[in-house]
Amino acid sequence: MDIQTSPDPVARARELGAEIVVAADEIERTRRIPEALLERLHASRLFRMLLPRAAGGDETEPALYVATIEELARHDASIAWNVFVANSSCLIAAYLEPATNHAVFADPAWNSAVDD
């Protein structure tokens, strides 16, 4: 499966599961997501689930979004929390002008691994 193109965010989260578990001790010890895992999370577009399509997001339906957060939490609750918080920030995008959306949510504001 190509983690960047799978239409199912739960499958993308599951695909990252082993990497998340391996990083869990480091995350707990350093209180940071390792850069390689953070890049994979960005590449998987899990931070863009609730971002409207017009702003470059996936506009994921709520039940599927919750199932994806639950899948991430099975591997590490702090990863699920980070993805949840990032997506909560996306909710304002529907109320912003396109230029503002681009300034906030486009590359490299979020991560260089994310395509516009």
Where are the model-predicted features located?
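Active-site-proximal polar cores
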Residues: 31
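Glycine-rich flavin
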Residues: 35-43, 48-116
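N- or domain-start disorder-to-order transition segments that initiate the globular core
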Residues: 3, 7, 11, 17-20, ...
